[in-house]
A protein has these predicted regions:
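N-terminal Rossmann NAD(P)H-binding glycine-rich loop of SDR-like oxidoreductase domains
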Residues: 27-47
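Conserved Rossmann-fold NAD(P)-dependent oxidoreductase catalytic core, especially the SDR/UDP-sugar
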Residues: 111-159, 176
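Short-chain dehydrogenase/reductase
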Residues: 103-107, 150-162, 182, 190-194, ...
Length: 340
């Protein structure tokens, strides 16, 4: 029954896309408090979709736009997730946990999201990252780049992606798998980037991982959400990873300068958090220890090739310039830093 429903829905999506208009969806977002999950909920509602924001129980709900249904769901409980997404047509699994908790919770949350999407007959959407590739073999990385993760987190993510792709091939779910660089934007600040925003507002030195003069890539959370919705509405993009790059590669120090300029501060003094410091702090901090194994990306960056996205969707990926996205993020952080 679910396979037939998915086939009918895919045909309807194709028909709506051919007419140049998105098909209205019933969309549940797991991890709707987060940086990307919150953006997906907002953008989907703005696009006219019926949105259910699934948040952890026992905490105050963040302010969501009018019209978004907010429900509590414990992602560690399969029964809770099944109930939270009941009746939905799309399940976006955007829930995250702190790095030290990945081995325990990332596979568990993934299994429960998959089971819930399958039970609901829903499309499963899983935002991917670049950890699955390991170290880059080329300047720009396309979807066919070897997947050779050398980190614990990379191997965990690869196992989850392979499980989801196999479920798609077996007809259990329809899978959408956009792959992003580091996401930034209003809603939350990643631990690696928070010292930059704090330093900019105080006009003090900031900390940056490994190499501030290497290239890096970021994508605004609203752009990532918009691209995700586009891929959901593009059946040819289902069942495969599709890269969604940022607006351009940028030297990390130049990104930091944009943050300081937006704050009205002077030229930033950047103190690089080197490998030795990571190892030293990691003796006492599980978070620093876990962050260090993926810090190589700030010295040996993965820059995503967006050719496939353009080919499948017929247009460019959303691309807010850093000169626009950074001030927008800083404005949010200025008023929300206590909870960011």
């Amino acid at each position: 029954m679910h396979r037939a429903r998915r086939r009918i829905r895919a045909e309807a999506v194709t028909l709506f896309a051919a007419r140049g208009c998105p098909m209205p969806m019933k969309l549940a977002v797991l991890g709707a408090r987060g940086l990307l999950g919150g953006a997906v909920a907002r953008r989907a509602r703005l696009a006219g979709h019926q949105v259910r924001a699934v948040v952890r129980p026992g905490r105050d709900s963040p302010a969501f736009p009018m019209g978004i249904e907010v429900v509590a769901g414990d992602l560690s409980s399969q029964a809770s997730v099944l109930e939270a997404v009941r009746g939905m047509e799309v399940v976006v699994h955007a829930a995250t946990v702190p790095y030290p908790e990945w081995p325990r919770f990332v596979p568990l949350f993934a299994d429960n999201a998959l089971a819930a999407a399958e039970a609901a007959g829903a499309t499963l959407v899983f935002p991917g990252n670049v950890y699955v590739y390991g170290r880059p073999r080329s300047r720009f990385v396309a979807e066919d780049h070897p997947q050779e993760p050398h980190t614990v987190k990379g191997r965990i993510r690869l196992a989850v992606e392979r499980k989801f792709l196999q479920a798609h091939q077996d007809g259990r779910v329809d899978l959408v798998l956009p792959r992003y660089p580091d996401v930034y934007g209003p809603g939350a600040i990643h631990a690696d980037f928070r010292p930059v925003f704090e330093g900019a507002l105080a006009n003090k030195p900031c900390r940056w991982p490994l190499n501030a003069d290497a290239l890096h890539e970021f994508i605004l959370n609203d752009d990532a959400a918009e691209a995700m919705l586009k891929l959901i509405g593009t059946p040819a993009a289902h069942g495969r990873a599709v890269h969604v790059p940022g607006p351009r590669a940028i030297v990390s120090r130049d990104f930091i300068r944009l943050v300081y300029a937006a704050a009205g501060s002077g030229e930033p003094i950047v103190r690089v958090f080197g490998r030795g410091m990571y190892r030293l702090v990691g003796l006492f901090s599980p978070l620093a220890r876990a962050a260090y194994e993926v810090a190589y990306l700030f010295d040996d960056p993965i820059l995503l090739d967006g050719t496939l996205y353009r080919s499948l969707t017929g247009g460019p990926h959303p691309s807010t310039p850093y000169e626009v996205g950074v001030p927008r993020t800083l404005d949010w952080f200025r008023t929300h830093r206590a909870i960011a």
